[in-house]
Amino acid sequence: MAVVEKKLWPEFFTEVLRGKRRVEIRLADFEIKKGDTFVVREWDPKIKEYTGREVKFKVKKVIKIPEDLIGFYPLHLIKKHGLYVMDLER
């Protein structure tokens, strides 16, 4: 099983720590599948550094969303990669 690491801004990282955020939506520009380990590392955009805090999850399910979903990411990147929805458990 693979280990995938991604940045997460402090306001979202806090939600993860409190258990209020278990579903992750990401640009599908990387490979991930059920059973992989997904690591979110807190990234502070003000100082452009990692804070040292991280949380590891086991990926329970991955759903790739169709390219026509418009939202958080630029449309050209969604069209190119699609999006992932990952159900995570600690």
Segments the model singles out, each with a brief description of its role:
Residues V62-R90:
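Glycine- and charge-enriched low-complexity intrinsically disordered segments
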Residues D29, W43-K48:
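Short, charged beta-turn/beta-strand-edge "cap" motif at the junction between a beta-strand
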Residues K48-V62:
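Short beta-strand-centered aromatic/proline hotspots
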Residues A2-R22:
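Short, basic/aromatic beta-hairpin or loop at an interaction surface
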Residues R26-D29, E89-R90:
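A structural micro-motif recognizing beta-strand termini
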